[in-house]
């Protein structure tokens, strides 16, 4: 049976583990910059200049990492 891959979780977990800065674009056009400290099905906790913000995913339009995210290692673990 083939595993279902949740690419959103893989992406957020990689930027969290590798401490990659991200820019979150909200649906209202506002931008938030910082580092992912945690996430669940509905929210992302972002650390920005020492302050934590909880962002609801339904308000997110786009997440842009400051450097490339390597999916290959994470996807290999899931597929093994």
Curated annotation (Swiss-Prot):
Keyword RNA-binding included in the entry's annotation: yes
One GO process term, biological-process aspect: regulation of DNA-templated transcription
Name of the coding gene: hfq
Assigned protein family: Belongs to the Hfq family.
HAMAP family the UniProt entry points to: Hfq (MF_00436)
SUPFAM superfamilies for this protein: Sm-like ribonucleoproteins (SSF50182)
Pfam families for this protein: Hfq
UniProt keyword annotation of NAD present: no
Ranges where the Sm domain occurs: 9-69
Gene Ontology, cellular component aspect: cytosol
GO molecular function: RNA binding
Function: RNA chaperone that binds small regulatory RNA (sRNAs) and mRNAs to facilitate mRNA translational regulation in response to envelope stress, environmental stress and changes in metabolite concentrations. Also binds with high specificity to tRNAs.
Keyword field: RNA-binding, Stress response
Subunit structure, interactors included: Homohexamer.
This protein's name: RNA-binding protein Hfq
């Amino acid at each position: 049976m083939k595993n279902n891959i949740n690419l959103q979780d893989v992406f957020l977990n990689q930027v969290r583990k590798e401490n990659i800065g991200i820019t979150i674009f909200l649906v209202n056009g506002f931008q938030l910059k910082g580092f992912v400290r945690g996430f669940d099905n509905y929210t992302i906790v972002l650390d920005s200049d020492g302050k934590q913000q909880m962002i609801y995913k339904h308000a997110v339009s786009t997440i842009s990492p400051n450097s490339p995210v390597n999916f290959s290692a994470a996807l290999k673990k899931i597929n093994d």
